[in-house]
Amino acid sequence: MYCQAMSLFRAAEGHRPQWGPWGVALGIMVGNLTLDKRKYADVEPDIKELIEKSQSLMDELKHLTDEDARVFEPLSRAYGLPRGTEEEKAAREAVMEHALLEASLVPLQIVEKAYESLTLLEELGEKGTRIALSDVGVGALFARAALEGASLNIFINTKLMKDRTQAEDLNARTEELIDKGRALSDKVYGAVLKHIK
């Protein structure tokens, strides 16, 4: 089991922290440990579907983590643009506004996908093998870390946006997902804890 988890982590990782993919990788591991067991024959089709969805989601989260770093680069460069004249200030402000939006939209996708991973982990916690149930709980913690970590990237960018309507819309969507994600993470973790303790 440990070797399987490590190979999934290696598949999920890059050169950046990958909390979201790691959480999904743990779900995949639980799913794989459930397959071909007589005790779980009734739910095997569901487990196979959950593994497939989780694999796709893990790939999306890995891509988004890399994309998050990529969209930050223009924002980082924009901070260094000249602002000595009014024209330079206006040009810098326009570049900054666009870069802040781009640097908020990708983390929002991470928040959405992290929440989606919690829904998959919830179902794996209900249907998956009991011998690896603790991994569902850890996966939920990783998913929550991804969700809340990405939300901080959104908030730090929206705070600087001049378009307050857009900033408030992004914040509202993020806060809604944080609330739902915290509740679901607590539910999944709590169910695991109740079963194993």
Regions found by a protein language model. Name each.
Residues 1-28, 131-150:
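Conserved phosphate/anionic-ligand binding catalytic regions in large, soluble enzymes, centered on
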Residues 33, 38-39, 75-82, 149-164:
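Acidic, Mg2+-coordinating active-site segments of isoprenoid diphosphate-utilizing enzymes
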Residues 35-80, 177, 184-186:
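A structural-propensity feature for long, helix-poor, extended segments
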Residues 110, 117-120, 132-191:
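Preference for long, well-ordered alpha-helical segments
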Residues 18-22, 50, 57-64, 99, ...:
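Amphipathic alpha-helix face/heptad-repeat signature
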Residues 1-15, 39-50, 54-57, 89-96, ...:
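Disorder-to-helix initiation segments
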Residues 1, 22-29, 64-67, 71, ...:
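Amphipathic, well-ordered alpha-helical segments in soluble domains
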